[in-house]
A protein has these predicted regions:
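SAM-dependent methyltransferase catalytic-core segment centered on the flexible catalytic loop
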Residues: 108-181, 189, 230, 247-299, ...
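Signature of N6-adenine DNA methyltransferases within the class I
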Residues: 165, 178-179, 188-247, 251
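Active-site-adjacent helix-turn-beta-strand microarchitecture at beta-sheet edges
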Residues: 216-220, 226-229, 239-377
Length: 620
């Protein structure tokens, strides 16, 4: 019986595998021959010594950091969660670098939209200082301190920020769907570096654009030269996205002309009851009408009855539409109106959403940070978070190109505005989008209102915001739809990043004579069966599947998916137990290595389960 691998997805091996698939001739004894690879790529290889490149101290280590597999895990926290058994939303407490590695096996190529609002590197908001040797240990140290700064006087001001964001973007890219999109909020301190970095990670041709968001109408006087009231949102696509982005839905308060002076003359036929007139009844003889500047030629007599044309009528003019377009517009509910002078105009019932402009402000129904602060204060009953992003901003960005069942990820989730926006969007259009929030549990400053209100760290603020915002959305919907059932998912499962539950997988453990007996144990003493279960699901890449606790021959086991996996972490497992597991028809079965009643039961388990059609049998 094989043992389960305890590491996260190895991106380096994944990349090598892809190269071997594309260029098998360049593989010799299992390794890449780069001379052969260069020869096959021909002129596309740049061997010149002088070339344009974006580099900084620590860049190579940052790449290695992203590619180094992790043996950490995510432990379930049911007491912090809401609607655990029914929700598909996730809130993960932990360093996002480690968490992104843990998400790879399950969510590789599955996330449609990523939005992040990373630290802006203002000198005082910087807590992420990754350790190349042990990022999990480094995370534990980070969460025991209230803040960390990156002063400009350090001499590595931009370098530290680049080394922080680079490996995270590398990992984020692999999570995006083939038509996925990433939005990144930033200010002018790092916007230039971010654009260069994003172009390197996602490809310059996949840079969609830069939006300017009106952050504030009353910016502070921090400079003698300029008031800064703009922040930026940069966007890249994964590569396979050919969709037009959807901006706001245009509503026309006035009628639009159906003619243009520069257009060629066309003849259009208006079928009976397709024109709207201001007069109830009348007759127009064929002839020239309209105005002197914009004449309109009526080609046959027109009879009006009940404010519309009783007969088929023909006009000749410099129309903007063809006959086919006219018929289509009328079929879709467009009103074609005619004045007393027979000047023709139209008003659409529905306009296609406009491509979003590069300015984001109240003209597209997006609030400022002042509005966002007031809204958050109303939800949390206090000023608990500095400079939150407005829900309307995130919702506006998500609406550019999102389906009703897509997954949204925010791995710098802060006050959880993105989760709020996803829930609000779902209730508005009946969608079933899921969110994944990731946040470092950075300690609250003891002098701030959040700490005085009882919040120890930022995660507690974000989780409470999701709870209260979800209830607010639910109550508002119920007020507007009395008697109807509310079915939008406003719950979330909380997980926390931690070291592995499996002692043999923990390469950070220190052993001496006093604790050497622990080596005979498989699971850490303070870990539960559910901790171990979700670690198994992480390693198998099925972290998003539903879990059912079942009874098998009086033993408690777990079934993941309808017939995908059975996990047995019980002791004294015998042949009858194995037979009962096989009858459930799973594809995968995982046991505790020392859980069998004897060696024969363990040896026979593989044989008997394979006879039942089980494809994969592992132990831990």
């Amino acid at each position: 019986m094989e043992k389960l691998d305890g590491l996260s997805l190895d991106l380096e091996k994944q990349n090598i595998y892809k190269l071997k698939e594309l260029f098998p001739i360049a593989v010799e004894e299992g390794k890449i021959n780069f001379d052969l690879l260069r020869a096959m790529l021909g002129d596309e290889v740049d061997d010149s010594k002088e070339k344009y490149q974006f580099t900084w101290k620590g860049k190579t280590k940052s790449i290695k950091l992203a590619q180094t597999p992790s043996a950490a895990t995510l432990r379930p926290c049911k007491d912090k969660s809401k609607d655990w058994d029914s929700t598909d939303n996730l809130y993960i407490e932990g360093d996002n670098l480690e968490v992104l590695k843990q998400l790879q096996k399950t969510y590789y190529g599955k996330i449609k939209i990523i939005y992040i609002d990373p630290p802006y590197n203002t000198g005082e908001d910087f807590i992420y200082n990754d350790s190349f040797s042990d990022s999990l240990k480094n995370y534990k140290e980070l969460t025991s301190q209230a803040s960390s700064s990156n002063p400009e006087s350090s001499g590595r001001f931009h370098t530290e920020w680049l080394n922080m964001i680079y490996p995270r973007l590398i990992l984020a890219k692999s999570l995006l769907t083939s038509d996925g999109i990433i939005f990144i909020s930033i200010n002018d301190c790092e916007v230039e570096n971010l654009k260069k970095l994003g172009n390197e990670v996602f490809g310059e041709k996949n840079f969609v654009g830069q939006w300017n968001w009106l952050k504030s109408k009353t910016p502070p006087n921090l400079s003698k030269k300029i008031k800064k009231n703009i922040e930026y949102v940069l966007c890249w696509q994964r590569g396979g996205n050919t969709n037009s982005f959807r901006g706001i839905q245009k509503t026309s308060k006035s009628d639009d002309p159906i003619t243009k002076p520069q257009n060629s003359i066309k003849r259009l036929c208006f079928k009976p009851n397709t024109l709207k007139f201001k007069i109830e009844k009348g007759i127009y003889n064929k002839g020239i009408y309209g105005t002197e500047k914009f004449p309109n030629k009526l080609l046959n007599d027109l009879e009006i009855e009940n404010f519309t044309n009783k007969n088929e009528v023909y006009f000749e003019n410099r129309f903007i539409w063809t006959q086919e377009k006219l018929d289509s517009e009328i079929a879709n509910g467009t009103d074609v109106k005619v004045s007393r002078q027979l000047v023709i105009s139209y008003k659409k019932a529905n306009y296609m959403p406009e491509v979003p402009p590069n300015l984001i402000d109240e003209s597209v129904n997006v609030d400022t940070t002042e509005n966002a602060g007031r809204d958050l204060k109303n939800i949390l009953k206090g000023n608990l978070f500095d400079y939150p992003k407005p829900v309307s901003l995130i919702q506006y960005l998500l609406n550019f190109d999102i389906g009703k069942n897509d997954i949204v990820l925010d791995f710098f989730s802060g006050s959880a505005t993105t989760a709020h926006a996803v829930m609000k969007l779902n209730v508005e259009d009946g969608g079933n989008r899921k969110f994944i929030m990731v946040q470092l549990p950075e300690l609250c400053n003891e002098k701030k209102e959040a700490y005085k209100a009882g919040y120890k760290n930022i995660c507690e603020i974000g989780e409470e915001r999701i709870r209260l915002a979800g209830e607010q959305i639910k109550h508002q919907w119920q007020d507007e739809h009395p008697g109807e059932e509310f079915d939008t998912d406003i719950g979330f499962k909380v997980f926390e990043l931690d070291s592995t539950n499996i002692i043999p997988w923990d390469n950070t453990a220190q052993y001496n004579e006093s604790n050497l007996f622990d080596l005979s144990e498989v699971f850490k003493e303070d870990r539960t069966k559910e901790d171990i279960l979700y670690e198994i699901m992480l390693k198998y890449g099925i972290f998003d599947k539903k879990v059912e606790q079942i009874d098998v021959n009086g033993k408690t086991m777990f079934r993941i998916g309808r017939r995908y996996m059975v996990v047995c972490l019980e002791d004294n497992v015998n042949s009858e137990d194995v037979k009962a597991i096989g009858e459930l028809g799973p594809r995968v079965v995982v046991f505790k290595e020392d859980g069998f009643i004897n060696d024969n039961a363990k040896i026979n388990a593989t044989y008997n389960l394979e006879k039942c059609g089980v494809e994969d049998i592992k132990c831990i």
